[in-house]
Amino acid sequence: MSPHPPQPHPPMPPMPPVTAPPGAMTPMPPVPADAQKLHQSTGNDACIKRLQQLNVEDGAKMYMKPTEPGKMGRPVDIQTNVFGIEVTKETTVHRFMVHAKADLTSTKEVTFTKKGKEDFVVQDRRDKCCNIFFLAVEKNPEFFKMKDGNQIVYDGQSTLYTTVNLFSELDANGTKSKVFQINGADTGNDDLKTLPCISLEIYAPRDNSITLSSENLGKRTADQNIEVNNREYTQFLELALNQHCVRETNRFGCFEHGKVYFLNATEEGFDQRDCVDVGDGKQLYPGLKKTIQFIEGPYGRGQNNPSLVIDGMKAAFHKEQTVIQKLFDITGQDPSNGLNNMTREKAAAVIKGLDCYSTYTNRKRHLRIEGIFHESATKTRFELPDGKTCSIAEYYADKYKISLQYPNANLVVCKDRGNNNYFPAELMTVSRNQRVTIPQQTGNQSQKTTKECAVLPDVRQRMIITGKNAVNITLENELLVALGIKVYSEPLMVQARELDGKELVYQRSVMSDMGKWRAPPGWFVKPATVPDLWAAYAVGNPGCRFSIGDVNQLVGMFIDSCKKKGMVIKPPCETGLYSTEKIMTQLEKVAASKCKYVLMITDDAIVHLHKQYKALEQRTMMIVQDMKISKANAVVKDGKRLTLENIINKTNVKLGGLNYTVSDAKKSMTDEQLIIGVGVSAPPAGTKYMMDNKGHLNPQIIGFASNAVANHEFVGDFVLAPSGQDTMASIEDVLQNSIDLFEKNRKALPKRIIIYRSGASEGSHASILAYEIPLARAIIHGYSKEIKLIFIVVTKEHSYRFFRDQLRSGGKATEMNIPPGIVLDNAVTNPACKQFFLNGHTTLQGTAKTPLYTVLADDCKAPMDRLEELTFTLCHHHQIVSLSTSIPTPLYVANEYAKRGRDLWGELTTKGPIEAKESQGERLKELTKEIGYKQTDLNQKRVNA
């Protein structure tokens, strides 16, 4: 089969987002898809470079015009968490920059308005900036035009808005800058009182005025041409609505993306149960996430209305407590006589990176924790200036007259003036207002946090209303009244539609009800054949209570059930029990003996082996199905038939079978279309900067899955791509792999390609329209100019929540949440683009998070009903459990391939990082070949089922 290289195009004008296929163009010789350079300077470099090589113009940064809302399904009233905003008058606001700094010494300066990353630093600087700035306002009312009724909106850092121009009467030099000298002692902030001269500068940038009016908001915020929309209106509204929180730093913790947490929650009207202790010296704080969104509103197409979307949430914070107490909470052991190495490492991971403070020098001194030292204050000695040595315990007794209560406890390692120093844990206190980061979580605490944060719809609604009142987003807020900003008290009610359940086709058909169904007895649609050479092994720690008899009993039940489903299976060649040390050697041995399938039963406590199984599977092409011993016990000892059914569903799909299809009465799943899901696994948090600086490869992993093999079967692979890219040059590899496989299996090219793409925020839509979609079209047109493209971005990273109209407390999550099939394609959608929300699944815990689908390209001009019906149908193709999924199966499977790619990359780099050579793109292509599935026999099987 000959490959189809993309044909480079001569330069042409930018394409509008909806185009007929361009006419014939002069072909030019293809340029090889070469290397992206080692460090990309923007998130689009790789895509832009490839477009230039192919001589393809960038696309226009234009959304598609919304089409008429869909009509299928029955109407349902839905409550939202969207509060309408009315701008009742015209107000001109002026933006100024604020800069606050002070000299600590003759050579060292501190800048308070500098942006920070760590929670404590962000909160601390905001607190100080507010103290400094509002003192300046109080002492200089003439400059700040307070008598003229000036309204001030300040972000607690470097941005200030006022309703009166502060520089209307310029001095002779026309300087738009004013510097105030502030005495830190007057601010009321203990940390500032030793600074007699703090410099606060206010200056005006160019073009620093906008006029806030309902007309301007309507015209300048939701245009199809993304580049003409003015983000400053959004920024100003968000700041105005957050002003109460910014000024009251002792009550509210303000964080990124409109998040606010309540530091004294019970005083703000929250329940004690909203603030539970989750272990490790950590406590949940309730909070809100507030975002300004421009929506169509209740009056339909062509309207643009500002709104405030408020979601309730909780996050774990570190308690303000001594580090010694924190160590006790983490370990459950008395730390006064020191911790053993394993416990110390566990505790160190939880406190590393935290800000803590001491007060024994008669002032508050902040330091950052780096770890826990293996020795105590009595055993750690250091040299004094006179050449003598003394222990840390003696030093504190002599210098500070402190007799340590726990002299044999481990010391804490802190960064102090650039060096690591050692401090008694009892004298250091964890600073408040620090959220628990992912590396600081422990298993138990993480589980408890997840459970407590998954609140039911009635609780979430209570949190939203309580929080909205606490942050003073009310009709009585004087600042908002003065600015003419009115936020409605009641959230928007909208009419959604509920699509019908689906018919699942096994040997006989069943209907889904509320996203669930029971598979009928009888054969799979396409039963697989289990390879003749297969084995079953259990691996466990001593005392895991799973015997060889249990293995054989499970295997007997497994074979019996496989046969009932029509699968061809013989008894295994071998069964056995192995220790963790010996199992990998055994698997290597049987793989070398041409064994093609192994059923592994692994102790729940053993988590490191799974990745090793998968690396061996990819390398040897011996399929390894891994299940937990708890699941095996549920089958063997508790007789759980459904668990066994799910295991066999997995086996059949892994071996290339198909369990069921979805009836396609509406003809949305036609044979001539290729449906591709594309998911992204970004490098682990915090590793990008570190790895890039050391010249190590740290790729993002693009998973993809499509129905290239057969219409209802979704199989895929992954590619390694440079990290830090908003647009995917790898869309080229994804499309070539998928189209080639489609042509190989279907003996024809697809007429339509539908891409569901995740991992893209609204902010990257413009770049995807400009670079990624033109690249995708160029690759597709290399096969045929007749193939049409539909490109849909899918995200759950938004703040919208939808609730049933009538909520009764005390029910289950499945009863209280909106049902599967709820679709919304007007009222709450962005008026500039073709968009819909579709709830595909039954929510088993917490409150439903309904995915948002934005159609960025549609050559077919598909009606909304058609896209919604296809998407909902695709939510029923999971094959393993008898439940619909929240996102379409191709995207779900693609995300699993991205995770699998991350695991295989992790195994590849266990022996050490891989150096980034000059041509990073080529190196990543080679490594993709090495650890991906394309070169293996598994590339047509869904091995990650």
Swiss-Prot record:
GO molecular function: DEAD/H-box RNA helicase binding; miRNA binding; RNA endonuclease activity; single-stranded RNA binding
One Pfam entry name: PAZ
Location of the Piwi domain: 636-899
Region (Disordered): 1-41
Transmembrane segments: none
InterPro entries, A to Z: PAZ_dom, PAZ_dom_sf, Piwi, RNaseH-like_sf, RNaseH_sf
All residue ranges annotated as the PAZ domain in the record: 322-432
Subcellular compartments: Cytoplasmic granule
Keyword field contains Ribosomal protein: no
Biased composition (Pro residues): 1-20
Record's keyword terms, sorted: Developmental protein, RNA-mediated gene silencing
SMART domains: PAZ, Piwi
Tissue: Enriched in sperm and oocytes.
GO terms (BP aspect): regulatory ncRNA-mediated post-transcriptional gene silencing
Tree of life domain: Eukaryota
Record-level GO cellular component terms: cytoplasm; cytoplasmic ribonucleoprotein granule; nucleus; P granule; RISC complex
Keyword Cell division: no
UniProt cross-references to CDD domains, sorted A to Z: PAZ_argonaute_like
Extra facts: Members of the WAGO (worm-specific argonaute) subfamily lack conserved metal-binding residues found in other argonaute proteins and probably do not cleave target mRNAs directly.
Subunit structure: Interacts with rde-12. Interacts with znfx-1.
Function (record text): Argonaute protein which is involved in the endogenous small interfering RNA (endo-siRNA) pathway. Interacts with secondary 22G-RNAs, which are RNA-dependent RNA polymerase-derived endo-siRNAs, typically 22 nucleotides in length with a 5'guanosine residue. In the germline, functions in a genome surveillance system to silence transposons and aberrant transcripts.
Homology family: Belongs to the Argonaute family. WAGO subfamily.
Protein name: Argonaute protein wago-1
Gene responsible for this protein: wago-1
